UniProtKB/Swiss-Prot annotation:
Protein name: Ribosomal RNA small subunit methyltransferase H
Listed InterPro entries: RsmH (IPR002903), SAM-dep_MeTrfase_MraW_recog (IPR023397), SAM-dependent_MTases_sf (IPR029063)
GO biological process, one term: rRNA base methylation
GO CC term, one of those recorded: cytoplasm
Chain's gene name: rsmH
Gene source species: Dehalococcoides mccartyi (strain ATCC BAA-2100 / JCM 16839 / KCTC 5957 / BAV1)
């Protein structure tokens, strides 16, 4: 039996949040090692379909082996989820019953030394999700001026010592490795302040900037929303406050009617609710899961459901609506096992 390097976070909660039904059509925007994808395929059997996306080609290779028994029920696409709508249109894969985002780094990305995501071991300052991207962490560290560096570390890392760190980097550069940079940051702030390493927030900021994570998330949420059929579910797992804030604010905006500024006496926006927030309070991992998988401790899950706007037609048949509504009421699905041959893989365009 093959052991996979990444443990899927809040797996049961993800399946319940998506309301997976037999014969449903789903998208996993963050394939990783394929743990969530595998569970979606099992629970949507018989007749379920899954499109799984990852910018990292090594994730596609690993997951293809894991999911090969599901055959043509799953389509693996090497692309960025910022291109979600184009991908679904390309493969005529719309509308869908549910879309999952499990944001942040997978364990295998953290543990892959050459990617430079971790400062625990010496590695080049890379931090790209895909080797096709041009900008690296080294480009930022060695090329940005002090003000640009300080602003970036504050904006994406919420680092209170951002100015001090930026000045120290400018004085000591060029930097080539993760350990060199982490040591310089630790010296700049005078050692640890709290339970996390002094370089943690700066490394987060660099990774977000290199991969344009926040702008891609904002774009992908809107695209995902438009791909959902009536009753379709959008599930997002985030790992830091910047991501969670974007998801929370998007869900709140789309779940209410008028979004005109408060100083306008009469509505002129004509905005209608198109999402229903399923969990008013954020869902977090259980103590048992955190003890089993410490990397899940910062995870937060939010779930929303697509509702029909006035004048909009239904995407799914009445039978599919019944299945979605049943899952919405009961929160349960039947577990099935699918056995097929030959996973379909596609590269990005």
């Amino acid at each position: 039996m093959i052991e996979y390097p990444h443990i899927p976070v809040m797996l049961e909660e993800s399946i319940q949040g998506l309301g997976v039904i037999p014969g449903g059509r789903y998208v996993d925007c963050t394939l990783g090692a394929g743990g969530h994808s595998e569970a979606i395929l099992e629970h949507s059997y018989p007749g379920g379909q899954l499109l799984s996306i990852d910018a990292d080609p090594s994730a596609i290779t690993l997951a293809a082996e894991r999911l090969k028994s599901f055959g043509s029920s799953v389509l693996l696409v090497n692309d960025n989820f910022a291109n979600l709508k184009d991908i679904c249109q390309r493969y005529e894969y719309m509308p869908v019953h549910g879309i999952l985002f499990d944001l942040g780094l997978s364990s295998m990305q953290l543990d892959r030394q050459e990617s430079g995501f971790s400062f625990q071991t010496e590695a080049p300052l890379d931090m790209r999700f895909s080797p096709e991207q041009e900008l690296t962490a080294a480009d930022i560290i060695n090329g940005y001026d002090v003000t640009e560096l300080s602003d970036l570390i504050w904006k994406y890392g919420e680092e209170p010592f951002s100015r001090r760190i930026a000045r120290a980097i400018a004085e000591k550069r060029p930097f080539k490795t993760t350990t060199e940079l982490a040591a310089a940051i630790e010296r700049a702030v005078g050692g640890r302040h709290g339970r996390i390493h002094p370089a943690t927030r700066t490394f987060q900021a660099l990774r977000i900037a290199v991969n344009e994570e926040l702008s891609h998330l904002e774009s992908a949420l809107s695209q995902a929303h438009s791909l959902l059929g009536h009753g379709g579910r959008l599930v997002v797992i985030s790992y830091h406050s910047l991501e969670d804030r974007i998801v929370k604010q998007y869900f709140q905006k789309e779940a209410k009617g008028c979004i005109c500024p408060d100083d306008i006496p009469q509505c002129v926006c004509d905005h209608q609710p198109s999402l229903r927030i399923i969990n008013r309070r954020v869902i977090t991992p259980s103590d048992e899961e955190i003890s089993r998988n410490p990397r899940s401790r910062s995870a937060k899950m939010r779930v929303a459901e697509r509702i029909i706007e006035p004048g909009e037609g239904r995407f799914f048949s009445s039978r599919e609506d019944e299945l979605v509504n049943h899952v919405s009421r009961t929160g349960s699905v039947q577990h099935g096992q699918a056995k097929h041959k030959g996973v379909v893989q596609r590269g990005g365009s």
